[in-house]
Regions:
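Polybasic, Ser/Thr-rich amphipathic helices
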Residues: 1-12
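Intrinsically disordered, low-complexity N-terminal tails
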Residues: 13-15, 24
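Ubiquitin system architectures
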Residues: 17, 27-64, 70-74, 78-80, ...
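The transition from N-terminal targeting/processing segments to the mature protein
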Residues: 93, 112-114, 118
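Short, contiguous acidic and Ser/Thr-rich linear segments
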Residues: 116-138
């Protein structure tokens, strides 16, 4: 038993967990619960534009075509709800959307401002439109529009969306219910 636990620990990929095969989505992509694909190679550039879903899809697919990325290879993110963490510069908390909160609320001290803004880590909660999984287009659309009213500096190029951990509603580990699977947290990697 101890050997199996150690074996599982060392054979586990840092960024993936395979729980259960769920079948395929409407496009024939295999769907696994709890298996998180890499989201590298998507040539998206974040900007200040707030898109409708139709406008975003048009711009997104034009971007993929321009960079010879096959949209059929884009993986789904199989979770009904996720938290996404990213860094940005804000002038005030009023820039946060209702689905967002600061990682450390106490970091907004006046003396910490640089050029009238605070550099903060933000968590955004997203729910899949179909209640089961996010398409790549859907999650990037939601992330893009959430970040559009914030300053990203020169880090505007999408590099990856990486699984980080699970967050639980309880404040103490003893308070976590055995049935609470938590909400997966992903980090947006941006480059310049």
């Amino acid at each position: 038993m101890i050997f199996d636990a150690i074996k599982k620990l060392f054979n586990k990929d840092e960024n993936t967990e395979q729980i259960e095969y769920l079948g395929t989505d409407k496009d024939g992509n295999k769907i696994y619960e709890g298996y998180y694909h890499e989201f590298k190679g998507i040539p998206w550039v974040f900007n200040k534009t707030t898109y409708t879903r139709e406008e975003f899809d048009k711009a997104f697919y034009e971007c993929l075509e321009e960079h010879n990325v096959n949209p059929d290879t884009l993986p789904p993110l199989v979770e009904p709800e996720i938290l996404v963490s990213y860094e940005a510069w804000i002038e005030s908390k009023s820039q946060l959307h209702p689905n967002e909160y600061l990682y450390e609320d106490d970091e907004l001290e006046e003396y910490d401002k640089e050029d009238g803004m605070w550099q903060v880590e933000i968590y955004a909660r997203f729910k899949a439109d179909n209640g089961q999984y996010f398409t790549t287009e859907e999650i990037l659309f939601k992330i893009h529009n959430t970040m559009a009213n914030k300053e990203l500096g020169d880090h505007v190029f999408f590099e990856n969306l990486v699984y980080d951990d699970h967050e639980f509603e309880a404040d103490e580990i003893e308070d976590i219910d055995d049935n609470d699977e938590g909400i997966p947290v992903f980090v947006v990697w941006l480059g310049s």
